[in-house]
Amino acid sequence: MAGQELDAQAVHQRRARVDPGWHPARGLSRLAESARGHRAGPALRPGGLAGRHRPRRGCVRGEAIATLRVLRWLPGADERWQDYAVEAGADTTVLDALVEIQRGQDPGLAFRYACRVGMCGSCGVVVNGRERWACRTPLSTLGPGRITVRPLYHFPVLRDLVVDMAPFTARMRAVGAAFTPGDGERRDARISGDSAERQEIDEAIECIGCGLCVSACTIVAHNARFPGPAALNRAFTLQRDSRDTARSTRWGVLLSDDALARCHGQANCTDVCPMGLAPTRSIIRLRQMATARIFKWGPRYGPRLF
């Protein structure tokens, strides 16, 4: 299981079994909302921060019983599903339940988390077939029946729900995701807050690298060279920044056969982003910028984009 890439069709079939309402293009409606100027901030999304700033110390007797089916895997062993029954209140999150399982039932259950309040993004998992932050997903919002929890797709699994984020970081490096300042005399940067440049950057800058969008992307499923939505979203913020001096070099990566040209625009990344970002829109803007560049400098500056 570790390190293996999933075929796109297998991913679709697997998700459809877990979440009958899932569709490869489910994010298009979310992208349309974003295009109309609606942006759901973290506090407005289901399972927001209210009421979950404290660690959960235990369940109150008499609370409802929820069943979590967790995908377990250890190196050298076969993956298996294991059921756990936990007491759950109205504000109990998936992360609360996992912590209770680890403390009281199965100390060997492995998962990753840090802040517990929706700030770090380290607790990303797939719950009932959809990518979510465990700390921001109340069990009460998941409906009746058994709740499935598995690791993110398209990442090597280290153990149980813990995935290796190294490929995510490598994709970021591949597109030159670091800001590159100019040499010579240092000058104060002046980018007006009401400029189109600043506004477009601000709409895409809040990515915290949780990896949910990469897990939801169907192109990453069968093309290991595709940078993925998070890396392309980051590239957009840099290509739009007039202070960055690596934009020409970065275009060489973005206009390769396996980057912008490969996105199918299904907007799954936009649909699952907990920060309310729209990576699909950033990719569309990069294509528009690339098209203008090609018209200006000639077709040798880029391949077929669409």
Predicted regions and their residues:
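Eukaryote-biased recognition of intrinsically disordered, low-complexity regulatory segments
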Residues: 63-83
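Intrinsic disorder at enzyme termini
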Residues: 35, 41-61, 286-288, 292-303
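Short, contiguous acidic and Ser/Thr-rich linear segments
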Residues: 82-92
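Short linear motifs in low-complexity or flexible loops
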Residues: 2, 8-10, 16, 24-25, ...
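Short, structured protein-protein interaction patches enriched in aromatics and acidic/basic residues
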Residues: 115-122
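Glycine-rich phosphate/adenylate-binding loop and adjacent beta-alpha elements
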Residues: 127-149
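Ferredoxin-type iron-sulfur electron-transfer modules in oxidoreductases and energy-metabolism complexes
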Residues: 92-107, 150-306
